[in-house]
Structures are given as C-alpha cells and as structure tokens.
Amino acid sequence: MDESFNSILEPENAWLFLFDDVSQLQQLPIVQNNQENFINSIDFNTGDVTTTNISGLNFQSLEESLNSDTSIENKPQIIEQIQFLQQQQQQQHDQIQQQLHNFQQQYQQQYQQRQQQYQQQYQKPYTPPSFIYSEKNDLVPQQQFHLGQENLQQPPQSLQQQQQPPSPSSPPQQQQQPQQQLQQLQQQHQQHQQHQQQPQFQQLPIQHELPQQSQLQHIQIQSQQIPTQPQPQQIQKQIQIEQPQVQVQQQIQPQQQIQPQQHIQLQQHIQLQQPQIQQQQLPPQTIQQKEINKKNQSKQSSNSMPLSQQIFFNTPKLDQHLLSYFQTQKTNNTINTLNVDQKRDNIEKQKENTSPPTPSSPVPTIINSNSTDINQISPSQQQQQQQQQQQQTTDINKILTLQQLEQQQLEYQKQQQQQQQFNLTFDDESKKSIKRINQNIANRNFRQRKKDHIKDIEDKMMELTLENEKLKKENESIRQQEHEGGTMAILKPSPEKKQLMLEIRSIVRQIGEALKEDNEKNLIYLLHMYHGAVAKRYSSIDKDAEQIASPEIQLRLASIGYVLKSTPFLTNIFQGIESDSWFNLFKEKANITSQQSVQLDIIREKYCEYNLKLLDEIHDLDSEVKKFFFQNIFVFQSYSISLKTSKPLDLSQQIEFACKLKLLKNKFFENSCLMFETFSSLSKILTPKQEALLLVEIDIFSCFNLKKFEMITNVWANKSKMKKSSDPFKIGDLSQIFEKP
C-alpha cells in the first residue's frame, strides 16, 4: 500500500467536514428563491390581484402586511402564498437531511474499506526496513551496509591468496593472480560509478576507495616478489585503474565542500570499517570470540535499555555535522599503516616459505607521476619503520598501562568511598539501634515505676477505705450505746444555748468590723449587747454543772477512766506559760499604760490563786467519787476488792455520796463564776477599744460548746486506747445501790 495514502476520517470526525457542506447547501435555496420564486402583489385600493416577480420575499414582509389594519379573512391569496412558502421550506429541509445522511453513509463505507486494507496489509509477511541500526548507534541504508560488507570481505581473500606460499612448480599461476585481481578491481570501479549516479548512494565510491588502494599496493608488492618479468599489459591496466581513482578523488573534494552532511556520513562508515579490517588481520578463533562477545553485549544492552532510550537511539542522528575534517585524515592514516603492516607480514612469510630465487633479469621500476605509492622498499627503510612501530607499540603499551593504573586507582577510590559510606550508614544504624534499645528500656522502667506507684496509691486507698469503714462501725456502735444510756441526750446543749452562742459570736464579729471603722459609739453599743448576752449565760452554767455532776455521767466517766484537768466550760487565759506570752503581745497591741498593766497583773495573780485551790478540791472530789464507784459497782484488776460488795448502801453512805456530788457541782460553778468576775473587772480597767480588742483576740464564752465537745471526744479516745484486759468488771448497778432500806 502506498505511503502517501490519505488519512482516514472516522465517522465522528467526519461531521466537521460535513458541516461546511451543509452551510453551502443552506445558501443554495436562498439564491434559488431569489431567482425562481414569483410572488403576487396585491392592490389593496381596487381589490384586484396582480402577480409580479419579487426577489427575496421573506416572512417578515408578510407579517408586516398581515399586521396592517385590514383583516386576513378578506385576503385569501396572502394565506395561500404563506402556505406555499412553508411547503417550500419543508421540502428544502428534507433535502438537506437526505444529503447529510448520504454523506454520512459514504464516509462510513470509506472508513470500513480503509480498515480492511490496513488489516490485509498487517497480515502480509514482514519486510525488512530500509535503514539498519549500526554498532555505533548510527543509521546506515541497508544496501549501502551490504555493499560495504562485501567490499570489506574481498581484500581478505586477496590477502589469503598472497599468504599462501608459492610453490616452485606453479610460477604461471602467480603471474595470473595479479591479472585476476586487476580485473576484479575494474569491475568494482564500474560498479562504484553506477552507484555514484544514484542519489541515494553517492557515498559509496569514497567509502570503497581505501580498500582499492590497499589492493593495488598488495599487487605491486607481489609483482616485486615474482621472479618473472612483468608484462606491459598489466602495467597499462594499473595505470588505467590509477587514473580513474585520481579523477574520483578530484570529484569528491568539491562534493565534500558542497555536501558536509555526506562527508559526515562517510566518516561514520570509515569508523565502522576500521574494526572489521582489524578483525580480518586476527586469526579466525579470536574473530569468532569477539563476535560472540559483541552479540552478548548487544543483547544485554538491549535488555537493560528502556523503551524510551531505544526509541531515541533508533531515530536518525542529524547533529553530527559539527565534526571536523581532520578525523577523516586520522582514519586514512591508520588504514595506511595497517596496510603497510600487512605488506610486511606477507613479505616475511614469502621469504620463509619460498626457496632462494633463481638468477633472472632485474625488474624495471616504474614510477608514475600520478601515483604516490613506492614500489620498492630498501632494508634500511624497513628497519626504520620497524623501529618506529616498536616505539609506537611501546608508547601505546605505556599509555594503556597508565590508563589501567588510573582506572584501578579510581575503582579503588570508589570502593573506599563505598566502604566509608557503608561504615557510616552501619554506624548510624548501630547508633540508632542503641538509642532505640535505651529508649525501650527507659520506657519499660517508666511503665514499671508508674505501675508500682499506682499500686501504692491503690493500697493506701484501700487502707483508708478500711479505716473509714471501721470508724463508721464504731460510730454506729457508740450511737447505739448513747441512745440506750441517754448520756448524749443529757450532754447535748439545748436550742436556747445554741442561740446564745450564735448571738455572742455575731456580736464579736460586729465589734471587729467597728474596730476597723474606728467608730467608738458603735463599739460602746455592741459592748453593752455583749454584756447582756453574757448575763444570760450565767443562768445556763448552773444547769451545765448539774448535768456533769449527775451520778450517771460520773459513772460513765469512771468506767472510761477520764481524769478532769480543768473546767470544761471556759478557756483559761490568765494562767500558764502561754497566757504570759499572750498578755505581753496584747499589751503592745492595745497600747496599755503602766498603771493598767499593774492592775492586770494583780487580777491575774488573784485568779491563779483561787483557780488552783478550786482545781485541787475538784480533783479530790472526783477521785472520791470514782473510788466509790470502783468499790460498789465495778472493779478494775488493780483493785484487790472482793466481788461480793454489791449490796445496797446505808443512808449515811448514800447521803455522803450525794454531798460529794453536790460539792463537785458547786466547785464547777465557782470556777465558772471566777472567770466571769475576772472578766468584768478587766472591762472596768480597759477602755472600750482595748476591751473590744480583747474580745476579738479571744472569744472566751463562745468556746464553751467546743470545750464540751472536746471533753467528750477525749473521753471516748481514752476508752478506745484502753486494753480489753483492763476493762472493769461490772458487779452492780446504781438502782441496786441507791435503793431505799
């Protein structure tokens, strides 16, 4: 199928082409209407209808005429014209649609035909491409590549023929060999001229010039070695061959100036021929090994190379015109040196294989003005050339060794760098691993500590909960005992007492605020209120003393082992070491004068004397009451009293016990009255501000309830500390002791 085949339009893309045709078709009816349509003109004044040819009548003109004052019913001709125009438009629309449908069908048929043609083409056998990808990543035409290979294969044949040792029995065959080679060269020259005429293969004569020159040199060398005389016909043929070669070179030089791209392609072809010439000089085994290695390398490179790079290398390279002309000269020089080496090898082999030459006539030397080759080589020149070659080989070997050493050093440096990087990475990884291990250990230790701490807290919480439960149980048991005995009901303050205590506390707070405001009138009024509340408190002290001195409470206190230390009603601010320090601070704050301080000291001394006497008497009475209970109701282990003393008492004993309880009550009352009297005497000595300061610093009478509560708590605390073995044994009851005789 031709490469210049038109591109296929798919049915979807064909619509774009059709729309242009449709736009042209739509314009045709407009032109036809302007030329063919004839519209009747109407005379509205006379009512007669006249038909005239009007070009370009549209619906707009008809609508304007219809919208006039006259009615449509009186104009049937206009209606007919409108209907006629509508029919024409419908017909045109139908025609356009049919044409579009026909165009679409045609394009679909063409598309299907082209698809079938492409399928048939792909089913055909494979045809090789016109270009071949060379070993040096260059594109070379297929015919040119095959011709180059054929021409390269021909010189080795001539060389093989030269390398064969000439036998003494066949001198005429040696004479025929150069004739055959000259004929072959003439045929090749004719072929090159034919290829030059073709535009695609203009490069071939230049490419094959070098092998021809090499063959001519071989022929000349052989002609020197043959003992027979050269024929004049052969000399003429050589001259005829050399002359067209010079002409070809003269033709190539202007072509190189005109066509730089062709010159670049020639350089590429020469570079391709160099390794082939070197391979021909090597033995066949080495050539086969090199070919196998090249195939393996090409396979590996093709496998390792990605698709994008393969596509890039398969594309033609057009940027090589930057190469300079001196590269071609280098390649020519290298090829000439190779040819000279081949000549020398052939000469040495022929000398070894051939017998000593027979005497013969000297060979005439022919010098052509046009040729540049030398037909005879002296032994001195050969030695010089050999020395030069040896020097070149030694230099090349030195350069190669240096390059190898440099490469080894570079490889060693790269290996060292890789090892250093590996060591660094290994060290980093080892450090990271050590850090991770340490972090893991630290995390484990922290978690273990956290767990231990949580366990300790949980244990403490459990202990506290157990203690709380124990206290709850003890309180419940105490409440049951109190409700049974009725002691709590007796010791609890009445609501009246609670109100008095609250009033006294509120008055003391108001006094403190008045001191801050420095309002003397308000202070005096509040002090009168305070003294009135204290007077009410006197009446309640007698009842409190009776409750404490009752036989039931004393029995409970005796069973517990409570020892009375001071009055349970009021705090003592006048006696003891703490009172001394407190009074000194109070004097400084209240700015008390020397006279006031002397009077205060006298009052304190008197209070201490009377208070000590009362406390001694209270302790004596308390011990006698407890002794009575221990002898008659219950017994401790310390007392050596028999258990048979629980008989009812006599009247004298009962009266004596009652008197002791009454004396105890009076002593409690006297102690409380002593406190009130001393406080009233202090109010007479101090000013209102000083007295207010004293009340604010120590709220004496408002602490009564707290002292009572403290007394009860101390009682039950002593009871809980006592051991079970020290508990008293109950041997009687108050009701039995105080029975009437």
Curated annotation (Swiss-Prot):
Keywords: Coiled coil, DNA-binding, Nucleus, Transcription, Transcription regulation
Residues annotated as domain bZIP: 429-492
Family: Belongs to the bZIP family.
Region Disordered, residue ranges: 153-237, 277-305, 349-390
SUPFAM superfamilies: Leucine zipper domain (SSF57959)
UniProt key word Transcription regulation: yes
Name under which the protein is recorded: Probable basic-leucine zipper transcription factor I
Domain of life: Eukaryota
Main location, first listed in the record: nucleus
Region span, Leucine-zipper: 434-441
InterPro entries in the cross-refs: bZIP, bZIP_sf
A GO term from the CC aspect: nucleus
Keyword Transcription regulation: yes
Subcellular location: Nucleus
MF GO annotations: DNA-binding transcription factor activity; sequence-specific DNA binding
Intrachain S-S bonds: none
Start and end residues of each stretch annotated as Basic motif: 431-432
Protein's organism: Dictyostelium discoideum (Social amoeba)
Function description: Probable transcriptional regulator.
GO terms (BP aspect): regulation of gene expression
Database matches in Gene3D superfamilies: 1.20.5.170
Bias (Low complexity) ranges: 153-164, 172-237, 277-290, 381-390
